[in-house]
UniProtKB/Swiss-Prot annotation:
This is Transcriptional regulator MraZ. Pfam families: MraZ. It comes from Desulfitobacterium hafniense (strain Y51). InterPro entries: MraZ, MraZ_C, MraZ_dom, MraZ_N, MraZ_sf, SpoVT-AbrB_dom, SpoVT-AbrB_sf. Residues 5-47, 76-119 form the SpoVT-AbrB domain. GO terms for cellular component: cytoplasm; nucleoid. The keyword Repeat applies. SUPFAM superfamilies: AbrB/MazE/MraZ-like. CDD domains: MraZ_C (cd16321), MraZ_N (cd16320). GO terms for biological process: negative regulation of DNA-templated transcription initiation. PANTHER family: TRANSCRIPTIONAL REGULATOR MRAZ (PTHR34701:SF1). Belongs to the MraZ family. One of its GO terms (molecular function) is transcription cis-regulatory region binding. Forms oligomers.
Length: 143
């Protein structure tokens, strides 16, 4: 399981250090793709395969499903850790997530999210305001 928040710098070649706490759970190879809210989603291969099967089962005749699957998979790339524990983020993913220098890696249960520091700060402020009402809504779901 992934949890926590870590600030790291992206170097001039587009490489980002993956926190040691995330490395073992991610494994040597994993998948990064365009996430929601202009962050990147990073999945261990086993989690990716489960998600891939669910997305493959969506009806391609439905425009929303087709658009989501197309966008999600078009940004997907297999990543490997180098000997220094870094990943190379492709330019298209860095551009999508507005990643320039400072990145925040966030553990979200079954995945890691990579955010630009500025977008994460904005998102966190907004999420903090909605946190209490979201908690109240989750009570209705038995959580």
């Amino acid at each position: 399981m992934f949890m926590g928040e870590y600030l790291h710098t992206i170097d001039g070649k587009g490489r980002l250090i993956v926190p040691a706490r995330f490395r073992e759970a991610l494994g040597e190879r994993f998948i990064a793709t365009k996430g929601l809210d202009h962050c990147l989603f990073v999945y261990p291969l086993d989690e990716w395969k489960v998600l891939e099967e669910k997305l493959r089962a969506l009806p391609f005749t439905q425009p929303e499903a087709r658009a989501f699957v197309r966008f999600f998979f078009s940004g997907a790339t297999e990543c490997e850790l180098d000997k220094q524990g870094r990943i190379l983020l492709p330019a298209n993913l860095r551009e999508y997530a507005q990643l320039d220098k400072d990145a925040v890696l966030v553990g979200v249960s079954s995945r890691v999210e990579i955010w630009s520091q500025a977008l994460w700060a904005d998102y966190s402020r907004q999420a903090e305001d909605a946190y209490a009402s979201a908690a109240e809504s989750l009570v209705n779901l038995g959580i």
